[in-house]
Amino acid sequence: MINFEAIIGIEVHVVLNTATKMFSPAPNQAQNATPNQFINAIDLGLPGTMPQVNEQAVQKALILADALNMQRVQPVLVFDRKHYFYQDLPKGFQITQQNFPIAQNGYVEIVENNKAQRIIIERFHLEEDTAKQHFVDGQILLDFNRCGAPLIEVVTAPVIKSAKQSKAYLQKLRQILIVNNISNAKLEDGSMRSDCNVSVRLKGQTAFGTKVEIKNINSLNNVEKAIDLEIARQVKALIKGEPVQQVTLTYDDKTNTNVFMRKKDNSVDYRYFIEPNIMSSNIDELLQKPNKAFNLTEFFTKLKEAGVNEQLNQLVVDDLTLFNAYTKINSVINSPQDTIRWLCIELMGQLNKLQKPLKDKTIDHLIILIQMVQKGTVNQKQAKQLIELMLDNGQDPQSLAKLHNLEQITDEKQLTQIIQQIFKENEGEILKNLDRVERIQKLIIGQVMQRTHNRANPQQVFIIVEKLLHDFSERAS
């Protein structure tokens, strides 16, 4: 790559997590649904149907426009028909925004080698998804649950220079989509799909090389691998003087290779024209609503200031369910460090081990548990035991702590009696070691914890031991 440079542009299709589809009242619930359970005559393009724009989808698009620093937002909503024949497109056309995309001219900021880099976003637009194809025994089976689902297609300028930059951009975009509740943004289930257009040219050359598209990559790590493979292939071809063909590839993670899908043809005429069944509509009212995006940079700064390490910072914005849980818990706990520690490490560690999902009831129970730890009702070891019990039978931590005798002993009178008894039993040992205070403290505290089965509050025990030891020393002298 000494004399060559890569030029990469990325198109990302994002499935919005709205309640209904883009142009119909059908539920937007393609994931884990029975095939063809959520279909509507509008999405199938049956005669006499009239599409209606999903206002929630438009609202999410406006929030994304703020998050991606888009300089131009279209005040009038206009849709076009994109005509082509394929079995997953029952109408024979897709409703999209070719000529008047809802937002243009923005950027996403990434960090590379401790330096901020801007990835230019040319445009993004709203459109509808197609049906999902299943290839079974030589047949193509169609599931129309996904047909008509609301999409946003985000298109970068061809400014990305490496596979590493591509991964960083997609990771940042994904985090933006998650924290703003725009999409679940999971590559593995298709709610975020990226097409990477890769070309290579000699350094100093102004014309672009031949563009090769890589589709259907199911993870961020695989995006990096697929692009690196394609850059290396094109460099090798150019060194040999061989032409690079304009083709579409897909990445096979089992063999770590890019596999040929089809030849690419730029001459396809989609016969775009304005969608006649959707009136152009002014969205000034929607533009006046609060469309302020969540400030991800500020969020990371606050976590860093709270002492949360970068790995955990990234983890909490990696999943919409987890981020929503964090937001709910921290609004009560008001401690990012405690929230992330007990949610991301302790609770999610157990849930992943048990292969159980995170439920609202569990989140409510975790809030109570963290409060119990903060008040000293239970110690950290007891709290971990309570998490296991909570997930086992679904009871709240307060009831479980009483039932299983897992509450800390915090009663000063009770602890003082226990410690005084230990002083009496070890009077000779204490007298011999009055000049070795730490040793005596360790001895007494150890016995207190043993007798209380680790239920005594260590901080309170230490304070009482210190006071009684001081009194004992004065009497002995």
From Swiss-Prot:
Enzyme class (EC, first level): ligase
InterPro entries according to UniProt: Asn/Gln-tRNA_amidoTrfase_suB/E, Asn/Gln-tRNA_Trfase_suB/E_cat, Asn/Gln_amidotransferase, Asn/Gln_tRNA_amidoTrase-B-like, GatB, GatB_Yqey_C_2, Gln-tRNA_amidoTrfase_suB_CS, Gln_synth/guanido_kin_cat_dom
Domain of life: Bacteria
One GO-annotated biological process of the protein: translation
Pfam annotation, one family: GatB_N
Gene Ontology molecular functions: asparaginyl-tRNA synthase (glutamine-hydrolyzing) activity; ATP binding; glutaminyl-tRNA synthase (glutamine-hydrolyzing) activity
EC number from the UniProt entry: 6.3.5.-
UniProtKB keywords: ATP-binding, Ligase, Nucleotide-binding, Protein biosynthesis
Record field: catalytic activity: L-glutamyl-tRNA(Gln) + L-glutamine + ATP + H2O = L-glutaminyl-tRNA(Gln) + L-glutamate + ADP + phosphate + H(+); L-aspartyl-tRNA(Asn) + L-glutamine + ATP + H2O = L-asparaginyl-tRNA(Asn) + L-glutamate + ADP + phosphate + 2 H(+)
UniProt cross-references to SUPFAM superfamilies, sorted A to Z: GatB/YqeY motif (SSF89095), Glutamine synthetase/guanido kinase (SSF55931)
Subunit and interaction comment: Heterotrimer of A, B and C subunits.
Family: Belongs to the GatB/GatE family. GatB subfamily.
Role noted for this protein: Allows the formation of correctly charged Asn-tRNA(Asn) or Gln-tRNA(Gln) through the transamidation of misacylated Asp-tRNA(Asn) or Glu-tRNA(Gln) in organisms which lack either or both of asparaginyl-tRNA or glutaminyl-tRNA synthetases. The reaction takes place in the presence of glutamine and ATP through an activated phospho-Asp-tRNA(Asn) or phospho-Glu-tRNA(Gln).
Name used for this protein in its record: Aspartyl/glutamyl-tRNA(Asn/Gln) amidotransferase subunit B
Organism: Mycoplasma pneumoniae (strain ATCC 29342 / M129 / Subtype 1)
Gene: gatB
